[in-house]
């Protein structure tokens, strides 16, 4: 049953061959020469940044190449299937497991222990009982193997985790642990992790140590830190060191390392914090995963280093740091794929460091966050990608942000009375003591606009058009004009599920002790990955009217924490970086007070929302919506236009008086008001089109 050692072979630096390449989904770029892989990864970073006007001119450096590109991975999370198959799911989706017996990217020591576990599971004489694979009435679901090297040139050691169902008998697990330690010299410790039922995550939140070491020092980056079962590890040792060196080179530009105060956010088990402490810096680590914080503290004690640690949610910890008036010269952020939360971004800027060092594993959320930091007064000084996981589409990026002037907002329309401004999500229209930077403060920074006043508003987590008057004496007249029945605001929303083609929702909404009549009209423009892209028009603009009405009929706005569907919101944040409402005020129409003409102003769909649509359904949905002029063009026009202008435009945002019929469809109990609801649907137009 003993597996033969699986040794690394010499591999040309620009090409790796694998017998599993056609079926395994683990290395999608393996067919490309290595220089082309690097070009594709740089293109991914450039493409993500180019969605945002504030970032599209930032230069992205060439990708730092990895050496080696084979047998480099320090950690493997592999699924276990029938007859002891161990590997990854096949490319193309689904749950067909590919038994990977000759993986070209795993470190040789990891390959050896995986081979032994495979042989052990297939050996009917092993007496493992219920530890057998789940598809054969056993309990094992997956394995997680971490390679640890504590000194340069030292032989590797392994920490092995067996992922099992919660009701498994631990005796067979203990026998398996004893067999692993006895037959595979590299195995230093074994634990069992209990999977959380139907969770898509490989690891559950509870583990039990079985045998051997509970943690080991690992040299990953510039110093050692403690590795334990299931803890995060950068995939490539050489690239981890390259990123650490680049971070330290930047910090040296701020002053002597021994004199710097550094805040390490999403600090994990202390890879950055411990390395900085070794240079004499004053370091504070914040991490929400308690076992990782404990490992950082223990490592600091063993290495005789001083670091401050705090186990807390990042945004909550930053609020306390602001209240304590903490001062930091630099802040390092190394978040998971979903990026930095909006409130954490605001708090980081309020702490006012000289520099923000952002290490990202997801170009899409990096671009989203850099766009927000730009509005908060931190501009990207450099963008450097690293090939952390060769042969895959993934790319690690180091962004250096420095203090800069807060830019003025984008003005879509300006005349003698008003400004129509494009507001970003999580930018308050009017400031407060806790959020002194606001859209109003940015508008008033424009020369000659010191008296500008906001007339219309949208929700904090909504983006889109906001109207300002230039002087206080204009406020009353323009407030009446924008509240009149002829004025209209049109939104683009993506909502959960597939709605009818057209409809109207009439429902009274309660505001404290008062009840208000309210009506919302919508039209489905497209379907994206099972969810509806809508043009939505509130007729009265009550508080949260669109969100409450759509929730009332069971089609909540994606990203709506208050009225929405929590599992769907979590999925879209984790998988697609949607950390806001998918709701954008794309168009405003009103009669100009001074000119008497109807003015139409549009703001294009922001980059983060375009990215979500592209990731969920490919470029087809975006192209279709753009062909219908449904996503806004970033300009203004007056009515009446010439007949030719009206014909050429043909926008899906134009509203026609289509006859309606009443449908007896029942409203959802998610309704956010107390009044009676009626739902009215219109027959679909002949040119209505669905894009899946």
Where are these regions (language model features)?
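Rossmann-like S-adenosyl-L-methionine
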Residues: 5, 171-406, 661-662, 680-681
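Extended interfacial segments that mediate partner engagement and assembly in macromolecular machines
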Residues: 5-15, 23-130, 136, 155
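Short cysteine clusters
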Residues: 18, 24-27, 361, 541
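Residue-level signal for inorganic ion chemistry
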Residues: 27, 143, 190, 362, ...
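Short hydrophobic/aromatic beta-strand or adjacent loop that forms the aromatic wall/cage
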Residues: 75, 394-399, 490, 583-586
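RNA pseudouridine synthases
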Residues: 404-519, 526-529, 605-616, 624, ...
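Pseudouridine synthases involved in rRNA/tRNA modification
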Residues: 405-409, 413-417, 427, 549-663, ...
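Short beta-strand segments enriched for Tyr within beta-sheet-rich domains
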Residues: 542-550
């Amino acid at each position: 049953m003993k597996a033969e050692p699986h040794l690394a072979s010499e591999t040309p630096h620009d090409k790796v061959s694998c017998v599993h390449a056609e079926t395994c989904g683990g290395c999608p770029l393996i067919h490309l020469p290595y220089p082309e892989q690097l070009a594709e990864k740089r293109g991914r970073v450039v493409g993500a940044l180019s969605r945002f006007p504030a970032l599209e001119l930032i230069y992205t450096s060439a990708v730092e190449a990895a050496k080696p590109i084979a047998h480099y991975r320090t950690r493997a999370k592999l699924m276990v299937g029938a007859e002891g198959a161990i590997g990854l799911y096949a490319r193309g989706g689904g749950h067909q497991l590919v038994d990977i017996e000759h993986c070209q990217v795993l470190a040789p020591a990891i390959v050896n222990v995986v081979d032994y576990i495979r042989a052990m599971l297939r050996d009917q004489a092993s007496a493992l009982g219920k530890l057998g694979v789940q598809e054969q009435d056993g309990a094992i679901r997956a394995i997680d193997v971490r390679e640890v090297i504590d000194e340069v040139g030292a032989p590797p050691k392994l920490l092995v985790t067996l992922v099992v169902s919660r009701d498994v008998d631990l005796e067979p697990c203990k026998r398996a642990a004893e067999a692993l330690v006895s037959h595979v010299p590299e195995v230093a410790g074994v634990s069992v992790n209990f999977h959380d039922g139907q969770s898509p995550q490989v690891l559950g939140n509870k583990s039990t140590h079985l045998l051997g070491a509970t943690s080991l020092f690992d040299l990953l980056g510039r110093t050692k830190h403690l590795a334990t079962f299931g803890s995060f590890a950068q995939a490539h040792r050489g690239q981890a060191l390259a990123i650490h060196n680049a971070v330290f080179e930047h910090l040296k530009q701020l002053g002597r390392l021994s004199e710097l105060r550094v805040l390490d956010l999403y600090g994990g088990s202390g890879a950055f914090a411990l390395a900085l402490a070794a240079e004499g810096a004053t370091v504070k680590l914040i991490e929400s995963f308690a076992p990782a914080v404990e490992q950082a503290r223990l490592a600091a004690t063993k290495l005789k280093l001083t670091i401050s640690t705090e186990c807390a949610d990042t945004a909550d910890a930053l609020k306390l740091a602001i209240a304590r008036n903490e001062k930091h010269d630099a802040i390092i952020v190394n978040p998971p794929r979903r990026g930095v939360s909006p409130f954490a971004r605001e708090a980081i800027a309020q702490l006012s460091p000289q520099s923000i060092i952002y290490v990202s594993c997801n170009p899409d959320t990096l671009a989203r966050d850099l766009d927000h930091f730009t509005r908060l007064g931190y501009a990207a000084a450099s963008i450097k990608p690293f090939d952390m996981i060769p042969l895959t589409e993934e790319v690690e990026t180091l962004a250096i942000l420095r203090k800069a002037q807060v830019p003025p907002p984008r003005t879509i329309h300006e005349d003698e009375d008003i400004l129509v401004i494009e507001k970003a999500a999580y930018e308050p229209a009017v400031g407060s003591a806790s959020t002194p930077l606001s859209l109003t403060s940015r508008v008033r920074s424009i020369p000659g606009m010191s008296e500008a006043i906001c007339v219309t508003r949208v929700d904090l987590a909504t983006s889109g058009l906001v109207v300002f008057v230039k002087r206080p004496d204009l406020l009353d007249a323009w407030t009446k004009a924008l509240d009149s029945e002829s004025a209209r605001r049109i939104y683009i929303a993506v909502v959960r599920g597939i709605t009818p083609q057209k409809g109207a929702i009439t429902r009274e909404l309660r505001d404290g002790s008062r009840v208000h009549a309210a009506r919302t009209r919508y039209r489905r423009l497209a379907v994206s990955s099972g969810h509806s892209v809508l043009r939505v028009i509130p007729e009265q603009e009550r508080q949260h009217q669109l969100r409450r009405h759509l929730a009332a009929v069971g089609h909540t706005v994606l990203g709506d924490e208050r009225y929405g569907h929590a599992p769907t919101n979590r999925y879209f944040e984790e998988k697609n970086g949607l950390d806001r409402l998918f709701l954008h005020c794309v168009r405003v129409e009103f009669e100009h007070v001074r000119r008497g003409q109807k003015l139409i102003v549009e703001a294009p769909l922001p980059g983060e929302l375009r990215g979500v649509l592209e990731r969920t359904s490919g470029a087809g949905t975006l192209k279709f919506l753009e062909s219908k002029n449904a996503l806004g063009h970033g300009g203004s026009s007056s009515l009446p236009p010439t007949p030719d202008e009206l014909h050429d435009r043909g926008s899906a945002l134009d509203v026609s008086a289509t006859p309606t019929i009443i449908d007896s469809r029942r409203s959802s109990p998610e309704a956010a008001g107390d009044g009676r609801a009626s739902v009215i649907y219109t027959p679909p137009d002949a040119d209505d089109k669905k894009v899946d």
